[in-house]
């Protein structure tokens, strides 16, 4: 099989809920990320063989969101496009499917990533059969199709509370983790550690010039001193709060994948090699710990031991996700999410799987490290993981 390399990878800033990116539909955000990834290496869009983009709550975005993103980015109409929905792991699964296409010889150049605008997710009302008596009920599309377990109809946070109880993580443990995430992301931005991965977004305004969004918005919204005083968000006696959980966000990320041969032919320097990847799943209510199942599978496929991995990125759907998976895998937080994670940076559902991979690539570069692993849980009890080697 062909070796798969990453030659370009960028993301938009992550916008807060109803924040700076809230008026930009997901396909438009995806287009900005795709165009940015292509421009970074001066790659002709006509050379792209396929586009695969993750997008979770697609209601209201129009037909074929990935196709829209590709066309808006200047990709020719002749290039096939696919939209992936693996809930929070959608962006990572898109990269995995792109890598598979290249490895098997079905493509030489694939753009893969993810996108989400949670601010624009609509409410639903069942009007096909009419309401014979009484009021109709509006259903929040974000809640129904993004943030609630389909089997027991509990919010994802209820599962996080159960995880904290099972693995003995206190409210204080989770708050400390959240504070560390905010501290790390703030310091990383101050040190310019996100400059290479984030591209600006010009947001059209009703009047005047577009507003430029150049930085993640979420990490500046917190009041650290208030974190210990927040009420439980999901269960009466729970320990998960709005502050130690990830937030509702908008954003997009895109990577350009190539076969090693094609990168050499085009004189493009690979940034990283995809060494292996894997999915795993168990009971839906324990989705929080599924990364601890997916990561060992990806490592085994890569013939790499966990001790050889120098830096890890776990998607912080909740603080307890980071804590529990570190505990299960025997990891220290010294090399996990060193530039902060989704608790502080934000979690645009379809984007996050690609976002953590892009962040990992930059962390490896910044620390002159070689091997990294990224893993992300997803609703329904699943997870995905990727192992990369910096070139």
Residue ranges and their predicted role:
Residues 1-24, 223-287, 293, 300, ...:
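Condensing-enzyme catalytic core mediating Claisen C-C bond formation in acyl metabolism
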Residues 55-109, 150-155, 221-247, 328-355, ...:
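Conserved catalytic cysteine-centered active-site region
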Residues 158-161, 197, 205, 275-344:
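Active-site pocket-lining segment
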């Amino acid at each position: 099989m062909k070796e798969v390399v990453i030659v370009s990878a960028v993301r938009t800033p992550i916008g807060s809920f109803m924040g700076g990116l809230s008026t930009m539909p997901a396909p438009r955000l995806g287009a900005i990320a795709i165009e940015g990834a292509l421009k970074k290496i001066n790659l002709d869009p006509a050379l792209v063989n396929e586009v695969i983009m993750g997008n979770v709550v697609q209601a209201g975005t129009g037909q074929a969101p990935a196709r829209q993103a590709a066309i808006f980015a200047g990709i020719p109409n002749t290039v096939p496009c696919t939209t992936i929905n693996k809930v929070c792991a959608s962006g990572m699964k898109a990269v995995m499917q792109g890598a598979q296409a290249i490895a098997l010889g079905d493509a030489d150049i694939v753009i893969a990533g993810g996108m989400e605008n949670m601010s624009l997710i609509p409410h639903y009302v069942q009007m096909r059969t009419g309401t014979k008596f009484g009021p109709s009920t509006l259903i929040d599309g974000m809640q129904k199709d993004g943030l609630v377990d389909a089997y027991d109809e509990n919010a994802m946070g209820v599962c996080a509370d159960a995880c904290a109880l099972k693995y003995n993580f206190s409210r204080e443990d989770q708050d400390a983790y959240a504070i560390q995430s905010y501290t790390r992301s703030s310091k990383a931005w101050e040190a310019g550690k996100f400059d290479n991965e984030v591209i600006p977004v010009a947001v059209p305004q009703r009047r005047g010039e577009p507003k430029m969004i150049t930085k993640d918005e979420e990490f500046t919204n917190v009041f650290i001193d208030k974190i210990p005083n927040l009420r439980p968000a999901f269960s009466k006696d729970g320990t998960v709060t709005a502050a130690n959980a990830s937030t509702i966000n908008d954003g997009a990320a895109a990577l350009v994948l190539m076969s090693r041969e094609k990168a050499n032919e085009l004189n493009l320097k690979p940034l990283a090699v995809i060494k292996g990847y894997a999915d795993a799943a168990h009971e839906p209510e324990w989705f929080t710990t599924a990364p601890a199942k997916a990561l060992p599978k990806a490592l085994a496929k890569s013939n790499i031991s966990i001790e050889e991995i120098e830096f890890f990125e776990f998607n912080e759907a909740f603080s307890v996700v980071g804590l529990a998976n570190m505990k299960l895998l025997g990891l220290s937080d010294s090399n996990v999410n060193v530039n902060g994670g989704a608790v502080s940076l934000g979690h645009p559902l379809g984007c996050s799987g690609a976002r953590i991979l892009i962040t990992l690539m930059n962390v490896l570069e910044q620390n002159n490290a070689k091997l990294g692993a990224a893993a992300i849980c997803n609703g329904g009890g699943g997870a995905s993981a990727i192992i990369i080697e910096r070139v």
